[in-house]
Amino acid sequence: MSMQGLWSYQRTSYIRRGIIMYYERIYGFDNLHKAFKLARRGKRWKPATARFEVNLLENLLRLSRELQDKTYELSEYHTFKVYEPKERDVMSNSFRDKVVQHSLCDNVLEILLRKNFLYDNYASRVGKGTDFGLNRLDGFMHKFYRQHGLEGWVLKCDIRKYFYSIPHEYLKRILEPYVPEEDVRWLLWYIIDSTADPGIPIGNQSSQLLAVLCLSPLDHFIKEKLGIKYYGRYMDDFYLIHEDKEYLKQCLKDIGMFLAPMGMQLNQKTQIFPLKNGIDFLGFHIYLTETGKTVWKIRRRSKGNMSRKLKKFRKLLDRGLITRESIHQSYQSWKGHALRGNCHHLVREMDELYNSLFKEDNKDVSITVESADRGESQVR
């Protein structure tokens, strides 16, 4: 049977008598194939990806069978350190496990959890993300200014070693009401318990959604019990804007007490400061002018991160481990993000580095700041 024929044979609506069969969504062949293509994106040059793709049909059928029979076993994690934006231990799983993660998260977990998430919860959400979160903060600051001018305060919070402090039993307890099928719970519990307790691996796709869920009760507490109108969170980085400094001090105490039973605590970067100082969020420093305009400035460390990344790309390109097109896409994505702020000079410096590193194979794709963004506003 051809692969197309097999897809047609295995394709299903995953619905029985009006009941959605969530676990079948995970191991269904067509969904696993879609998950493979998502896991492969940007990683085709890696040997592990190539090895899996050589025997694609066999590997996908084996995964489907193992998940269906519950004989699926996670491969051993590969642990390494990353130093940007801060030092962290990342636990990366094998390519076949990444395929399972995509199928689990994209076809089941995100669908089951999204109704519980607060609107201003931006990480790992379809239709949300960093741009959405930045625009919401920008809008909040404009609205606050119209009501109170610059006379406001910000409580900026960050949780100490967030991923490493999430207790497994607490996570399972808040997950259970949203996961109706025992088979799906089996897979989730297996993944959660695959590392030491407390803590979940940063490298897993499922960990991102689970980490978003873990603080969802805190989101509702801040919005509904504390009554904070201007609030946003991206993973464990969140802010509260209010006109009363003393009330934010009380909020800080209440948030600390709310987190304590979970085994979590706010880190030393948590602070209360005047709104006129501006807010660091998602790589930008956003502040209000005296006339109520917002100004965005990208943080300088973003330049250093991209500079190191481009130099690494040059080495990978020389070894034939990455394509010229993928480098260009990555750089243009960073530049599009950077150009949202008042940082055209910084981007020009990065253009010079980019063109110097890839000048021999960059003649047809180089885009300058002027041609890419003639109409971009620096002040909003």
Residue ranges and their predicted role:
Residues 2-6, 93, 98, 102, ...:
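Right-hand nucleic-acid polymerase module
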Residues 4, 9-16, 22, 107-164:
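Active-site-proximal segment of RNA-dependent polymerases
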Residues 1-61, 370-380:
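Non-catalytic, polymerase-adjacent accessory regions of viral genome-replication enzymes
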Residues 48-52, 74-81, 115-121, 149-156, ...:
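Short coil/turn segments at secondary-structure boundaries
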Residues 13, 42-50, 75-101, 116-128, ...:
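Short, conserved non-catalytic motifs in the polymerase core
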Residues 30-33, 57, 61, 93, ...:
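Non-catalytic, well-ordered alpha-helical scaffold segments
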Residues 59, 66, 135-235, 239-256, ...:
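Conserved polymerase palm-domain catalytic core
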Residues 53-71, 76-79:
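N-terminal juxtadomain amphipathic helix
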